[in-house]
């Protein structure tokens, strides 16, 4: 069995390209750790950059991208199950598993072996919370996490009212229905963190946002709405899907959308780094690199 390699980093750090070039070199396959790239036809807004999976004339196999329909709400429990199916398959075929992404909760869940069980919806709780603001819900969630000592659901993944309500629902369920530890074992992994200078990251985020808008991100969202997906379901996915949906539906002007979305992505990248630093405090050893050459110096 091969020791997994994990490549993590904030948005616009270049982690996917580093991971795919590594995969081409060591006969690896990528398991995505991105909470939004699981959705089909949500390509531009999630930054799938599938061209990065073609290296030196070779297609790099990838997993957990384009696996569910847009409009659904994929969750951590499903991700953990899908990850282990992909991981076991890659190991069985003697290939090198490479976990790559920026969703810290997903990465930590599979590395640490979070003990998870499916949590049903709580209609009464949802009704009681539906009129509360995101700030109020965040405060409630913080208090629940204080009670349980939970490390799940930080601000990186709870950036809308719907997401916050679901997080509260899960934390409250775990208080009301404690379950014995069971499930996945922790996975030993060499963890590579792709570091990028803050100002360069901001520059790349701004440049990439404008490129994606030019590529037709608004048309992508119009197409999803045209399929009958309600605007609130797209807003649930946050960032590009939240703000561009508000533009397409007339809530924001184009300039307002660009300005607010750009700020939100910068804040998101900062929260991603906060999560990764938190992982280090929780005992994960992350080897930070700036480029591909640094990576190969770490490999046996």
Language-model features: where?
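Phosphate/pyrophosphate-binding catalytic cores of soluble transferases and nucleic-acid-acting enzymes
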Residues: 1-300
């Amino acid at each position: 069995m091969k020791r997994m390699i994990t490549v993590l980093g904030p948005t616009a750090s270049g982690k996917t390209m580093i991971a795919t070039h590594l995969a081409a070199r060591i006969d690896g396959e990528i398991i995505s750790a991105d909470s939004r790239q699981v959705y089909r036809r949500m390509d531009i807004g999630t930054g799938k950059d599938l061209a990065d999976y073609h290296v030196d004339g070779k297609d790099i196999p990838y997993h957990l991208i384009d696996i569910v329909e847009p409009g659904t709400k994929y969750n951590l429990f499903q991700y953990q199950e899908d990850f282990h199916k992909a991981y076991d398959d890659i190991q069985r075929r003697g290939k090198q598993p490479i976990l790559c992404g920026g969703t810290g909760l997903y990465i930590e869940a599979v590395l640490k072996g979070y003990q998870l069980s499916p949590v049903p919806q709580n209609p009464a709780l949802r009704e009681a919370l539906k009129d509360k603001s995101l700030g109020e819900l965040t405060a409630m969630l913080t208090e629940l996490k204080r009670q349980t000592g939970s490390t799940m659901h930080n601000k990186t993944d709870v950036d809308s009212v719907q997401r916050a309500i679901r997080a509260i629902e899960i934390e409250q369920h775990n208080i009301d229905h404690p379950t014995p530890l069971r499930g996945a074992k922790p996975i030993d992994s060499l963890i590579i963190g792709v570091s990028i200078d803050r100002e360069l990251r901001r520059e790349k985020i701004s440049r990439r946002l404008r490129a994606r808008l030019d590529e037709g991100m608004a048309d992508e969202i119009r197409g999803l709405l045209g399929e009958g997906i309600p605007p609130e379901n797209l807003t649930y996915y946050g960032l590009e899907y939240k703000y561009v949906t508000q533009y397409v539906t007339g809530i924001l002007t184009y300039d307002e959308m660009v300005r607010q979305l750009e700020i939100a992505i910068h804040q998101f990248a900062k929260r991603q780094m906060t999560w990764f630093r938190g992982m280090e405090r929780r005992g994960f050893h992350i080897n930070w690199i700036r480029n591909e050459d640094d990576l190969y110096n770490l490999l046996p």
